[in-house]
């Protein structure tokens, strides 16, 4: 293997690690800023907006939905109540949000 492919593959691994580190460290902040107003800090959906929308508790949602289904809902929304965030957030951010939300059920 020549030097360039080694450097390129090492750089790619570094970037993947950086994305993973972002998802772990900042997903909670993003969730609290954008999601908790409806879903609640604990994922219970017991906020004023959550009650109005009749949101389900994270324990029920996480048990019934796979992570990839949740990713699609965050990306595309769930009209009429859930806005789409696919244009606001990148794939790593959305994945991090879903992972953080699901972690609230543990």
Features from the language model and the residues they span:
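Electron-transfer interface patches adjacent to heme c in soluble/periplasmic c-type cytochromes
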Residues: 56-68, 85-93
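Post-cleavage N-terminal segment of exported redox proteins
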Residues: 1-24, 100-106
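C-terminal capping alpha-helices of c-type cytochrome domains
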Residues: 73-75, 80, 86-106
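Electrostatic cytochrome c docking/interface patches
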Residues: 15-30, 46, 67
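Periplasmic/extracellular electron-transfer cofactor-ligation site
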Residues: 28-54, 76-80, 103-106
């Amino acid at each position: 293997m020549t030097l360039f492919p080694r450097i390129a593959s090492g750089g790619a691994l570094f970037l993947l690690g950086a994305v993973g580190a972002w998802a772990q460290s900042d997903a909670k902040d993003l969730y609290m800023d954008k999601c908790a107003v409806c879903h609640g800090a604990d994922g219970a959906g017991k906020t004023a907006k959550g009650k109005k929308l009749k949101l389900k508790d994270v324990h029920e949602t996480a048990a019934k939905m796979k992570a990839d289904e949740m990713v699609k809902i965050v990306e595309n929304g769930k009209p009429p109540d859930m806005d789409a965030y696919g244009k606001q957030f990148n794939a790593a951010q959305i994945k991090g949000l879903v992972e953080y939300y699901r972690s609230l059920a543990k």
